């Protein structure tokens, strides 16, 4: 059995995506977010939000052995040495940027690791904007007065954070 086990090939193989291609996908990601949301309002929420929403996100790309910091409000995408929130393959980050359902899919398939305390929750507060958009919830002035939606979002975020701490 040892020989058979050693002969097994890895099930999940990822393609390495070069950093320049990821950067191009990020530009499309920014355009998609900005076309569905009031970016000025997103900036205001980011500045005054008690839950630290829409902050820059730091991801370590395992196969490229670099960390990137991105901010769809400022449209910035840079390499960094700051502590990452999550770690994943370059193909997974590129998938998030190319698909409006990308982060949702990643949370289901689990192709990432949390590398800092509360890293997943912090990343979710930034990346979940497209999950909301896919549900027909855009960040616009009228959304601020839709208290059931705000309550739903905060309740789900709290549940996820509580489960991760357990």
What does each of the following model-derived ranges do?
Residues 1-166:
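Feature captures hydrophobic
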